[in-house]
Amino acid sequence: MERALILAASAIGAGLAMIAGIGPGIGQGFAAGKGAEAVGKQPEAQGDILRTMLLGAAVAESTGIYALVVALILLFANPLLNLL
């Protein structure tokens, strides 16, 4: 019974962790839109805008990657099962 409860809670936790991937997707879309708008207003600053936008996208994506790692650990290398 305890093993089934831990596996169910791990699956729910993995699902909640993957919901965290929604935020970076929305943020990156918003940043890309604003970056395109900025390049449209100042085409001569395209290099600086692109560099800043890519750095921001990388930082935002790290949250989604961390959530994916947590979900994979909970599903495939569950450390809680060793406590039983």
Curated annotation (Swiss-Prot):
GO molecular function per UniProt: lipid binding; proton-transporting ATP synthase activity, rotational mechanism
Function per UniProt: F(1)F(0) ATP synthase produces ATP from ADP in the presence of a sodium gradient. F-type ATPases consist of two structural domains, F(1) containing the extramembraneous catalytic core and F(0) containing the membrane proton channel, linked together by a central stalk and a peripheral stalk. During catalysis, ATP synthesis in the catalytic domain of F(1) is coupled via a rotary mechanism of the central stalk subunits to proton translocation.
Membrane-spanning residues: 6-26, 64-84
Protein name (Swiss-Prot/TrEMBL): ATP synthase subunit c, sodium ion specific
Miscellaneous notes: The ATPase of C.paradoxum is of special interest because it uses sodium ions instead of protons as the physiological coupling ion.
Subcellular localization: Cell membrane
Residues marked Reversibly binds sodium during transport (site): 65
Annotated InterPro entries: ATP_synth_csu_bac/chlpt, ATP_synth_F0_csu, ATPase_proteolipid_c-like_dom, F/V-ATP_Csub_sf
Domain of life, source organism: Bacteria
Alphabetical list of PANTHER family matching this protein: ATP SYNTHASE LIPID-BINDING PROTEIN, MITOCHONDRIAL, ATPASE PROTEIN 9
Predominant location category: membrane
Family membership: Belongs to the ATPase C chain family.
HAMAP family: ATP_synth_c_bact
Family matches, as Pfam families: ATP-synt_C (PF00137)
GO cellular component: plasma membrane; proton-transporting ATP synthase complex; proton-transporting two-sector ATPase complex, proton-transporting domain
Keyword Transmembrane helix assigned: yes
Gene symbol of the encoding locus: atpE
Activity-regulation annotation: Inhibited by dicyclohexylcarbodiimide; the enzyme is protected from inhibition by Na(+) in a pH-dependent manner.
Assembly behavior: F-type ATPases have 2 components, F(1) - the catalytic core - and F(0) - the membrane sodium channel. F(1) has five subunits: alpha(3), beta(3), gamma(1), delta(1), epsilon(1). F(0) has three main subunits: a(1), b(2) and c(11). The alpha and beta chains form an alternating ring which encloses part of the gamma chain. F(1) is attached to F(0) by a central stalk formed by the gamma and epsilon chains, while a peripheral stalk is formed by the delta and b chains.
Membrane topology term: Multi-pass membrane protein
